[in-house]
From Swiss-Prot:
It comes from the Bacteria. The chain crosses the membrane at residues 4-24, 29-49, 60-80. GO terms for biological process: ATP synthesis coupled electron transport. It holds the Pfam family Oxidored_q2. It catalyses: a quinone + NADH + 5 H(+)(in) = a quinol + NAD(+) + 4 H(+)(out). NDH-1 is composed of 14 different subunits. Subunits NuoA, H, J, K, L, M, N constitute the membrane sector of the complex. It is a multi-pass membrane protein. The keyword Transport applies. This is NADH-quinone oxidoreductase subunit K 2. It is found in: Cell inner membrane. It comes from Geobacter metallireducens (strain ATCC 53774 / DSM 7210 / GS-15).
Amino acid sequence: MVSLHSYLILSAILFSIGTIGVLIRRNAIVIFMCVEMMLNSVNLTFIALSKHLGNVDGQIFVFFVMTVAAAEAAVGLALMIAFYKNRESIDVEDIKLMRL
């Protein structure tokens, strides 16, 4: 059986990879994928702690996080499609040049 410590280390590694991806990458789609990876690493932590403590609160909270992540992905991708139609690029530097 895999220990809690292993799950927490895996979650920290996934979160770190996601954070580095958000900070380094310029492509908005890749940034969204890295944010989703970070959310999934938090979900892994919730599930591992929920199983370790014998409490279902962490598992219930994961459903809410997954719902918010799905909504965030839908809105983010819709914005990226609209931006691509407008500028024909999804580079983050081009988004900074946009004015309201």
